[in-house]
Amino acid sequence: MDTIFAVSSGLLPSGVAVIRLSGPHVVHIVKTLCGCLPKARFMHYGNLIARDGSFLDSALTVFFPAPHSFTGEDCAEFHLHGGKAVVNRFLDELSTFSGCRIAEAGEFSRRAFMEGKLDLVQAEGLADLIEAETESQRRLAVMGTSGHLTTLYRDWRHKLMKVRAFIEAELDFADEEDIPDTISDKIWKDVEDLCTSLREHIREGERASILRDGLKIVIAGAPNSGKSSIMNRLAGRSVAIVTEEAGTTRDALEMRLVLGGLPIFLTDTAGFRKTENKIEQLGIEVAKQHVREADLVILVYDIVNPKQVDLPETSAEIWRVGNKLDLYEKNDPCWSIQFSALTGLNFDCFIKKLESFCHRRASEVGNLVPARKRQLQLLKEAVKEIENSLNYHSLDLSLRAEHLRRASDFLGKITGDIDVEDLLDIIFSEFCVGK
């Protein structure tokens, strides 16, 4: 097997660049460049000398002997000065060693998986942790890296295997006196309880998608109610055209924000009204579709001249807000909140209300939830097999046990305990090269 190397510390130039190595030739390479093998897991400061005798850099080197390393192989890290020329010269030197090459994307993590240092849930959590941009995404990723999810899935799989063992005992030893009669009848209640736990876990995972993918907030209302002004004030810059002419927003305008630690996808839509303009009609249809898919609809009214708006059916929470408070400074209880997007009057209260909504939605997510669609899909497949074993009482007992075996395999594929070779390239290609 090759020894692999890569920059693991990010973009250059930087104050420090970390070069990671892993593989069977690490000891030889470290001894050659450092002139010695540093004490395991201790930082060693010294000059790095190329094999032609030229000076490479003064650096910190740390050696991690197998199996006590990230990959489970011999590993080393070189902490160099982060100049591009310094790093490129060092990488060139590493490439001159026989059997040493630059790592592919995610190859360090893949080796960690192959050596049993990570399971697939932890590997996916690690990828999500690296990509996390918000506190909610970080929290969701940590659920995966902690190992608690893996423990849960393996516990559920063990329970299914135990149930199958009881059933097969009845099938194989039904004539033996020391095997209780119809022992399998006594364990189907446990299977039902497990199925209930899986269904709730799936529901939690679907709710948790907002932490990873973000909340969809749609600004809707009649033309000239101030929707684009709200969009611009939330963005802190001009991103939507604001004019006195009605119907200027004809396509949905989307923007990404972070509110209350959650990623938000904010959409400004065409004004709802009857029109003969074909292009504007198309824009209104697009607006209706965004409303149907939203988590929150901010239905904006001009409080000086409010116009009725009929929204399409949606499961979203709907706020009826009054805009243009600067022109009509009276408190009207028919609005969820009143403000002026133009002047900013009371707009800070509107933002606090939005942040509170985000916090509330984030708090609905449990502490242990599946973070990936792959995990959710396999959980759903497992539930389907368990339901088949529970619902079809007329099936031969051996066939019901087979459904439980298939459910157990689906749970095993989540963690990688069951062969998932065909998925590894897809999963680890999401990592950066140095991970």
Curated annotation (Swiss-Prot):
PROSITE patterns per the UniProt record, alphabetical: G_TRME (PS51709)
Keywords attached to this entry: Cytoplasm, GTP-binding, Hydrolase, Magnesium, Metal-binding, Nucleotide-binding, Potassium, tRNA processing
CDD domains tied to this protein: trmE (cd04164), TrmE_N (cd14858)
Gene Ontology cellular component terms for the protein in this record: cytoplasm
Localization (cell): Cytoplasm
Cofactor: K(+)
Gene Ontology biological process terms in this record: tRNA methylation; tRNA wobble uridine modification
EC assignment: 3.6.-.-
Ranges for domain TrmE-type G: 214-359
Cofactor binding comment, as recorded: Binds 1 potassium ion per subunit.
InterPro entries reported for this sequence: G_TrmE, GTP-bd, GTP-bd_TrmE_N, GTPase_MnmE, MnmE_dom2, MnmE_helical, P-loop_NTPase, Small_GTP-bd
Binding site for (6S)-5-formyl-5,6,7,8-tetrahydrofolate: 20, 77, 117, 435
GO molecular function: GTP binding; GTPase activity; metal ion binding
Record-listed GTP binding positions: 224-229, 243-249, 268-271
Chief location of this protein within or outside the cell: cytoplasm
This protein's record includes keyword tRNA processing: yes
Similarity comment: Belongs to the TRAFAC class TrmE-Era-EngA-EngB-Septin-like GTPase superfamily. TrmE GTPase family.
The name this protein goes by in its record: tRNA modification GTPase MnmE
Gene: mnmE
